[in-house]
Amino acid sequence: MSFIREFKEFVMRGNVIDLAVAVVIGAAFGKIVTALVDKIISPLIGVMVGGIDFSKLSLTLKAATVDTAGKEVPAVVIGYGDFLNTILQFIIIAFAIFIIVKMINKVTNKQPLPPETPSEDVLLLREIRDSLKK
């Protein structure tokens, strides 16, 4: 089988196409969550805790300076505000995926059917077998 034919069969399998659709939808959902966190949730939390803009939170390790040649040396800063926003985005996405998986599992995990009771013929044959063992 040629390489191209094998690749075509691989791509045309249902699981690969489902995965591709899931990746595209996931990317779009990620953008929605990013906008939700950056434009709605973070500003609301910021207002509640005293007008803080979470995306601008940072820790300055070394202030900006001007060197002997007159050039500005930028500050060394750890911008943890964006990191906090990213953690919040992750939590929202993980929770949404958890809910979706939980619903899918609920739909697909149906109660197993009770085992069938053996027919009269089978019961009679078992009785004969058991009596012959004695």
UniProtKB/Swiss-Prot annotation:
Transmembrane segments: 16-36, 81-101
UniProt GO molecular function: mechanosensitive monoatomic ion channel activity
Membrane topology: Multi-pass membrane protein
Domain of life: Bacteria
Compartment(s): Cell inner membrane
Main location: membrane
Key word Lyase present: no
UniProt entry tagged with the keyword Transcription regulation: no
Gene Ontology CC annotations of this record: plasma membrane
A matching Pfam family: MscL
UniProt entry keywords in alphabetical sequence: Cell inner membrane, Cell membrane, Ion channel, Ion transport, Membrane, Transmembrane, Transmembrane helix, Transport
Protein task: Channel that opens in response to stretch forces in the membrane lipid bilayer. May participate in the regulation of osmotic pressure changes within the cell.
Subunit structure: Homopentamer.
Family, similarity comment: Belongs to the MscL family.
NCBIfam families reported for this sequence: mscL, PRK00567.1-4
PANTHER family to which the protein is assigned, alphabetical: LARGE-CONDUCTANCE MECHANOSENSITIVE CHANNEL, MECHANOSENSITIVE CHANNEL MSCL
Protein name, as recorded: Large-conductance mechanosensitive channel
Native source organism of the sequence: Xylella fastidiosa (strain M12)
